[in-house]
A protein has these predicted regions:
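Histidine/lysine/aspartate-rich catalytic loop segments that bind and position anionic ligands
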Residues: 168
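Signature of N-terminal electron-transfer/Fe-S-associated modules in redox systems
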Residues: 1-165
């Protein structure tokens, strides 16, 4: 069972690419260890909005570790301390009670800051439009009847698929 942690959160705030930026500091209390990093930022934003303050702006899309939109620098490391994981797949159990967690945007001339930790990713669109990506020919999918599956295995697979119908 995960325990709750309390920590100091320092987030980068900036109103645009030419604006001066600064860190704002927040004390986060009793955050469950099974909370994802982005969910923790959602909790911060709920607190900011309830207090009449502007929410912290950050990018995200799928929240399933696929798209990479959630890219942040956390404590000076891309995506934080978890090796090979995107920010949305980083859980608060990776941190300790009393930690200071610093959140910053990607810093690159190619990706100017729009606001806080949201960056302009149109440079990626230009690369894709120019054909600057890798594709792999994987062949065609096998015929559905090429691999025989027992009725028991098919029933079990269907039960599992039905169970995760919520998308969790």
């Amino acid at each position: 069972m995960d325990t709750n942690i309390s920590f100091t959160l320092k987030v980068w705030r900036q109103n645009g690419p030419k604006a001066e930026g600064h860190f704002d500091t927040f004390e986060m209390k009793d955050i469950p260890g099974d909370t994802s990093f982005l969910e923790m930022l959602d909790i911060l934003n709920e607190q900011l909005i309830e207090g009449g303050n502007e929410p912290f702006v950050f990018d995200h899309d799928c929240r399933e570790g696929i798209c990479g939109m959630c890219s942040l620098y956390i404590n000076g490391h891309p995506h934080g301390p978890a090796q090979g994981a995107t920010t949305c797949q980083l859980y608060m159990r990776r941190f300790h009670d009393g930690d200071v967690i610093t959140v910053e945007p990607w810093r690159s001339a190619a990706f100017p800051i729009i606001k806080d930790c949201m960056v302009d990713r149109s440079a990626f669109d230009k690369i894709i439009a120019a054909g600057g990506y890798t594709s792999v020919r994987t062949g065609q999918a096998q015929d559905a009847n090429a691999i025989l599956i027992s009725k028991e295995a098919a029933d079990e697979a269907m039960d599992c698929a039905t169970c995760i119908g919520c998308g969790a």
